[in-house]
Amino acid sequence: MNLKELLNNIEAKIYGKVSPIEVRNLTKDSRNVGFGDIFIANKGKQFDGNDFSPLAIENGAIAIASSIYNPFLSVVQIVSSNLPQLEAELSAKYYNYPSKKLCIVGVTGTNGKTTVSHLIKTLFDGCNKPSGLIGTIEHVLGNNRIQDGYTTPESCLLQKYLAEMVKNRLTSAVMEVSSVGLVLERLAEVDFDVGVLTNITLDHLDFHGSFEEYINAKLKLFSKLPATGLAVVNGDLSYASRFLEMTQAQPITYGIECPADYRAMHLRSSPFGTDFDLVYRGESLPCRLPLIGKHNVYNILAAIAVAHQHCNGDLQQLISLAANVESPRGRLEPVFSGPCPIYIDYAHTPDALENVCKTLHALLPEQGKLIVVFGCGGDRDQSKRQIMAEVVERYGFAVVTSDNPRGEDPEEIIKAICSGFVKRNFSIEIDRKQAITYALSIASDRDIVLVAGKGHETYQIFKHQTIAFDDKEIVREVLSSHV
């Protein structure tokens, strides 16, 4: 597409002479700009992209998209007071509106987004509905897998990924939809067909300011759904009705405690999985899930509801597929399954930590204890630090350590966490590797060890550096050194 075609009917002020020169790419990173690119000069917390516009032009940019006009720039300028919306419009048009050619499933909620998205993709694929995935661990675009660190990528990347899915002849895209991504308008030009709500608990208050604003951000997904779409909501949530009232889409509920369209009853748990009866329209079907934890029953219910409704899938076929699913990396992932099982999990909110601790505590043999290695991320919601300690204290012994301290002092973060303990049933080890080593050294054959907070991550972020760090590899390293 050339620049003249791209800018035709775009809602923005255009400065400079627009020629039919071919557009090669849209990017927000001036270092990646080449000839024919449009540079999106975004103003972030640390850097102002407008400061890098001259470098982008030097590298070959043919146009600059910005929220301000700069009279000293020599190329076409596309100016809008709402730059995120402009970025979304330009990106969607440039890639020929790929979301209109896919079934787009958006999964939102505080916890469970990654697992539910992964399970929906698994069921879609099993029903011969090849799908892509946009999420925290990775983006699956067909044979191409990308890890860029975004749960919900910025518009110029998101539209590019969706276009690649179309090119690879996928029929669906399952997306994790973060509240931050919704507020920042990264999804402004994405046409959703299905919205899924997993749960709502405290998180991201550092960004949203209040719990009410956090809920309002999540509601944006459901307000985008068309009348022909599906709103799949956890009916056990106290906020469920707000989400269903917000949308014109067909309401579908799932749950365990309350009557729902898809309800799990008579849960039976073991170290190897969970059995339950799936009740749908008065019919009860036995289900076997090879994942542990009540929270994973909610996750598979959401996935089955989406696949059954949207793929017109056979319910018994979906139940058979569910019996063979795997959990995503770093989600209650067993690293060692012998005496004293060891798990890693991404749990970094009070609710997620409660779910995994409660699940593992129920599996303890008599006189066994749960040992939990955890910390809290720096430069993030500080209100949850004390609560995390309260959660762990209810279920076992805590080894408090560093997570991703970022710009904060790790000792200060740990001090805030420890203020939540009532008993002295915890230990402190700032170095995460040493904390894992210590936890394994004090564990007996009757104990279970949980290393929480980072899950699939392979790095640790400090103020002045990011180092390679993988909880799973550290556990394996410590175990091998003690063989």
From Swiss-Prot:
One of its GO terms (cellular component) is cytoplasm. Pathway: Cell wall biogenesis; peptidoglycan biosynthesis. UDP-N-acetyl-alpha-D-muramoyl-L-alanyl-D-glutamate binds at residues 30, 151-152, 178, 186. The modification N6-carboxylysine is found at residue 218. Its cofactor is Mg(2+). It is found in: Cytoplasm. Coiled coil: none annotated. A motif (Meso-diaminopimelate recognition motif) lies at residues 403-406. ATP binds at residues 109-115. Pfam families: Mur_ligase, Mur_ligase_C, Mur_ligase_M. Keywords: ATP-binding, Cell cycle, Cell division, Cell shape, Cell wall biogenesis/degradation, Cytoplasm, Ligase, Magnesium, Nucleotide-binding, Peptidoglycan synthesis. Meso-2,6-diaminopimelate binds at residues 380, 403-406, 453, 457. Carboxylation is probably crucial for Mg(2+) binding and, consequently, for the gamma-phosphate positioning of ATP. Its main location: cytoplasm. It catalyses: UDP-N-acetyl-alpha-D-muramoyl-L-alanyl-D-glutamate + meso-2,6-diaminopimelate + ATP = UDP-N-acetyl-alpha-D-muramoyl-L-alanyl-gamma-D-glutamyl-meso-2,6-diaminopimelate + ADP + phosphate + H(+). One of its GO terms (biological process) is cell division. One of its GO terms (molecular function) is UDP-N-acetylmuramoylalanyl-D-glutamate-2,6-diaminopimelate ligase activity. Its EC number is 6.3.2.13. Belongs to the MurCDEF family. MurE subfamily. NCBIfam families: murE, PRK00139.1-4. Catalyzes the addition of meso-diaminopimelic acid to the nucleotide precursor UDP-N-acetylmuramoyl-L-alanyl-D-glutamate (UMAG) in the biosynthesis of bacterial cell-wall peptidoglycan. This is UDP-N-acetylmuramoyl-L-alanyl-D-glutamate--2,6-diaminopimelate ligase. It comes from Chlamydia caviae (strain ATCC VR-813 / DSM 19441 / 03DC25 / GPIC) (Chlamydophila caviae).
